[in-house]
């Protein structure tokens, strides 16, 4: 009598043997790729017939590389893979005993199938890579699902806003839609959960990709409504180059222009040369930066910096002119200085009027009144016959003249005080005022532009994705 364990082992061995024979027989009888595609694409298949109304097309994108972002042409170049998925009931082959559940083909077979005819409608240029053959991939699944993949190089538009240049962020767009079919025939949608995938971290010499956003909208055309899938890439500018090549050199140039405050009022030629050279250096640095930028009509952050620096240098030249004017008599003999000072006093004499008492002015008023009456052959009435307002008029005129003399006297005192101010004093206060004002400007400038770098966009997706 056999042991029950051996009976069980014999049974399992026979079962495995029969299963292996069945699998081998099944593989021998399965339909290969050529048989399946020939059977599917026979005369009954019509590539112009829409699989369903509407056909739902799911789209996702793999970003391979961004090669450039240009301010002059306001566009960017990108290499990407675009994937499309849809179902075609005419291509179901599950009942054909296929050897594989999915079959891969090239673009030659793809041209024999119905396609949603999608494209990037806002691209400036687009091309499918050919290295060494056309980079088009087609996979047909046994349940009738199709997957197409194109490796493309595109040039898309960017919405350049340079008000914060070089501390700016730029947004570039690509819009994908079916060129031939409206929403009644083809519905487009992003493939979830990851409609856009970065194959690597995108970093350029002057930009880095920090965010992207996707959106799906319906756009109205004369022929109906179309689904549009838009992806927006957010690039943040790397401003280190501009700090090293623009901001720091201009700071040094402005500081050099302050050296003239310490050279003294007698070194006018050297101070003039220093100020003019600083202004020319600022102009050259400004032109070297903006020559690679578009000619926009608004003020950029770099413009504020450069123009403010030019203003500081120009004000230092004005201070030099004031010092030169104040020290124009320096080095002259004492007698010549005294004569010059006397001439200045004589020029200022025109500012003051004769000091007369109110009684003398009132007497002069009545004398003039009598003379005019005699010239007109008319009798001069006594004072009692004048109206009160007529008697108050000379006193009002006297008051106005006295106020005018007082104002002119104060102005003359200020002029004398300015004349007594020494050029060394002006240089001393300028050496304090200019660095302090420039430091306050720097605090305001960097606080405003560096704290307002963040621009918020709807549906932003962080690039750190699984």
Swiss-Prot record:
InterPro entries membership: GABAA/Glycine_rcpt, Neur_chan_lig-bd, Neur_chan_lig-bd_sf, Neur_channel, Neuro-gated_channel_TM_sf, Neuro_actylchol_rec, Neurotrans-gated_channel_TM, Neurotransmitter_ion_chnl_CS
GO biological process: chloride transmembrane transport
Traits of the deletion mutant: Grossly normal movement.
TM helices/strands, residue ranges: 243-263, 273-290, 305-325, 428-448
Residues carrying sugar: 32, 102, 143, 211
Gene3D superfamilies, per the entry: Neurotransmitter-gated ion-channel ligand-binding domain (2.70.170.10), Neurotransmitter-gated ion-channel transmembrane domain (1.20.58.390)
Membrane topology designation: Multi-pass membrane protein
Any one GO MF annotation of this record: extracellular ligand-gated monoatomic ion channel activity
Primary residence: membrane
Tissue specificity note: Expressed in a subset of cholinergic motor neurons including cholinergic motor neurons in the ventral cord, the retrovesicular ganglion and in head neurons such as the SMD, RMD motor neurons, the AVA and AVE command interneurons and the SAA neurons. Also expressed in a small number of glutamatergic neurons including the pharyngeal neurons MI and M3, the PLM neurons and a pair of neurons in the lateral ganglion.
Annotated function: Acetylcholine-gated chloride channel subunit. Forms functional homopentameric (in vitro) and functional heteropentameric ion channels with acc-3 and acc-4 ion channel subunits. Currents in channels are triggered in response to acetylcholine, but not in response to GABA, glutamate, glycine, histamine or dopamine.
Protein name, per record: Acetylcholine-gated chloride channel subunit acc-1
Lineage: Eukaryota, Metazoa, Ecdysozoa, Nematoda, Chromadorea
